[in-house]
Amino acid sequence: ASGDYISNKKAPTSQYRPKLKGDIEQITKLVEAIEQSEKPIFYTGGGVINSGTGASQLLRELVKGTNFPITSTLMGLGCYPASGSNWLGMLGMHGLYEANMAMHDCDLMINIGARFDDRITGRIDAFSPSSKKAHIDIDPSSINKVIHVDIPIIGDIAHVLDDVLNMWKARGRKTNSAAIDKWWSQIGEWRSVKCLDYKNSKKTIKPQFALERLEELTRSRPDRFICTEVGQHQMWAAQFLGFEEPNQWMTSGGLGTMGYGFPASIGVQIAHPKALVINVAGEASWLMNMQEMGTAVQYKLPVKQFILNNERLGMVRQWQELLHGERYSHSWSDALPDFVKLADAFGAKGIMVSDPADLDDAIMEMLSYDGPVLFDCLVEKHENCFPMIPSGEPHNKMLLGEATTEDAIGSSGAVLV
């Protein structure tokens, strides 16, 4: 049989053309607010990283020029150096006390590339009640989605910050410096709380101590890249490891994907063959993609798997302890592998350490080995991650340690996982 062939019609396709330049009237309002603010804060997120390294440099120039404090979400770590004097540390559910308190009490919040997610805001009706809020984001759907803002600026972070800086300089680089000095004095009082302090042990390795030693022994490496899995170890890594540049911290934030870190570290190592690439992991997350050790061995990738092994699903166990009356379910394992033997079976190097006195030597052995390493660090099984904003509570109500947890979480918060 024969017939006429009729080709498919060309389907119409939509195009995404993001707006790069921000509205000049809104930028003017932001500059005016910067000039007048008495208690400002820069609240930064992953959008700064995504905008490119130029955005981070412009941000640093703006922070230095204004002397405003700066905090960051989990995904924005590295956009401003952790060694910088204006750095307050990460904010949010497991963020630092001084960062969360400054966010709550500020009179000007400048959101740059963050999304006001629930781990940052706490209870929305109590979120930073007295502040004027500006929000710079390339995605218009993120503006006013969760928190109403007073100064919305849609555009690419680098383009907008460049315009903000140029306008602020042209107007005389003014700030309310006397008021900002008082603001820094208040922040100093919050810093004196020392919210990351913990009770160390000479018998068992505390996970915080393990990461402090890892930081001390690796922070001089400019080519250090850190990946993580998801859980308590991820939060401790964000608290105790410092990042000086963007794109040196790879983690699964909003999605919270257990199993992400190991394949991510392989990708980073392939992209940077000579770099030091460390995946900070929990044993449960790491086992979700353990088969990738075969990839690391096959391609001779010197990735370091730094497992904080508490034999628990630590974050799940912590929530069950604090929110659900210690009714534990499916948050531990009695059938974990011997990770040293597992590494050997793959043809990698395995190291196990359980004594705090041996930790530094074990870390140095891991760092000096030119090949993939599975580092099994046996840590305190029931250590909780603090500070912590309880679910259903405002972001200025934080648990700072075990002594603050009793009756801290109501029944309404217990359902907000």
Regions found by a protein language model. Name each.
Residues S56, N100, D105, N144-V146, ...:
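Thiamine diphosphate
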Residues Q57-T66, T121-P140, P246, P387-A403:
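A short, gly/pro- and small-residue-rich
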Residues S2-Q15, P81-A82, Q186-Y198, N247-Q248, ...:
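Gly-rich Lys/Arg/Thr-decorated short loops/hinges at beta-loop-alpha junctions or inter-strand turns
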Residues Q186-P263, V268:
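Active-site diphosphate/adenylate-binding microenvironment
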